[in-house]
Amino acid sequence: MPLSDFILALKDNPYFGAGFGLVGVGTALALARKGVQLGLVAFRRHYMITLEVPARDRSYAWLLSWLTRHSTRTQHLSVETSYLQHESGRISTKFEFVPSPGNHFIWYRGKWIRVERSREMQMIDLQTGTPWESVTFTALGTDRKVFFNILEEARELALQQEEGKTVMYTAVGSEWRPFGYPRRRRPLNSVVLQQGLADRIVRDVQEFIDNPKWYTDRGIPYRRGYLLYGPPGCGKSSFITALAGELEHSICLLSLTDSSLSDDRLNHLLSVAPQQSLVLLEDVDAAFLSRDLAVENPVKYQGLGRLTFSGLLNALDGVASTEARIVFMTTNHVDRLDPALIRPGRVDLKEYVGYCSHWQLTQMFQRFYPGQAPSLAENFAEHVLRATNQISPAQVQGYFMLYKNDPVGAIHNAESLRR
């Protein structure tokens, strides 16, 4: 059969015509679908703006609080339950609703914004064991200012929640995370130290904060170390907490006895400490002993974890140590500390915080019983010092709690403080 006759036969065949038509329709639909997909990709690329915030970013918690404030009509929610312990010891429960994982739409300054909160169940945070999360904002247009405004509002909202409070951070893995809720700032005058001691420390810290250029011009590392030593209960940690509130700084709590703390991790934590924060190393004598005592017990000298003594020294004042940092260390036994740890450059100011003096006792009495005659405070101090000359502010405060509204009774029974 000639080729022309074969083509004419196919043309007259109804089955072939129908099949060819179906192929044509299918091809057209596939091309249209591909065109729509390419069009959507081009539209998203050129006419939409997207912002992704991973859970590790510091603004992630801010944005969740911001979403809670702005997505009041969202019907798909997750709950975050937390416990708050008051100074009286009473514990209250707080519930906070946040948008659940999924897609949400909010109206913000004349724009619809799509918010996608995603949770990867196959990926977890090895430090906390929680699934990996992220939140993605999508808006029409190409102006990034809308996202800057959202981040700025979220930051301001977080600052309002922390206003007048001190934020505590603790080390979790390789980063600092807030520890509990921000605490109400403790007034500096609520911690009564020996006369002039608090003013001397505050003046030194403030001078350091206000003069970074002085250190730079002279080639001196811009960091400052403090050591407060003395008997337990004399106000070392309490003063540091009050000082942070006075300076509007946060506190980074770091335990040197943490078994997971290594040299590299310590150096990293000190380098990524939040700005405007005080790094607090409490009871440093419990982690390391003097090298003179290490001969008898070398294992104890090397600490309870993977942190080495040389690693601590290098983190505080080594080639890789960071600047713009304030470190406070406390100890009850300064004689147990190695001289290399407390030399200038690592510890620039050492202050003894000891038992109550006559002046401290009078100040504490007047603060606890305002409006009483100064002679009563003098009388109380004399009675206490006759009973004992080694009494800590914590003991005096505990004693006052027994006579909340009875200053005369506190004076008459001061002999009970005798050891």
Curated annotation (Swiss-Prot):
List the InterPro entries. Answer: AAA+_ATPase, ATPase_AAA_core, ATPase_AAA_CS, BCS1_N, Mitochondrial_chaperone_BCS1, P-loop_NTPase
Any one Gene Ontology BP term: protein insertion into mitochondrial inner membrane from matrix
Result, substituting residue 155 to P: In MC3DN1; abolishes interaction with LETM1
Residue ranges annotated as coiled coil are none
Q: Does the keyword Flavoprotein apply?
A: no
Q: Topology with regard to the membrane? A: Single-pass membrane protein
Tell me which residues bind ATP: 230-237
The linked condition is: GRACILE syndrome: GRACILE stands for 'growth retardation, aminoaciduria, cholestasis, iron overload, lactic acidosis, and early death'. It is a recessively inherited lethal disease characterized by fetal growth retardation, lactic acidosis, aminoaciduria, cholestasis, and abnormalities in iron metabolism.
The terms under GO molecular function for this entry are: ATP binding; ATP hydrolysis activity
Put simply, this protein is called: Mitochondrial chaperone BCS1
Impact reported for residue 183 to C: In MC3DN1; causes a decreased incorporation of the Rieske iron-sulfur protein UQCRFS1 into complex III
Question: Mitochondrial intermembrane compartment: which residues?
Answer: 2-15
> Main role?
Chaperone necessary for the incorporation of Rieske iron-sulfur protein UQCRFS1 into the mitochondrial respiratory chain complex III. Plays an important role in the maintenance of mitochondrial tubular networks, respiratory chain assembly and formation of the LETM1 complex.
Give tissue specificity per the record: Ubiquitous.
Q: Could you give the subunit structure recorded for this chain? A: Interacts with LETM1.
Gene of this entry = BCS1L
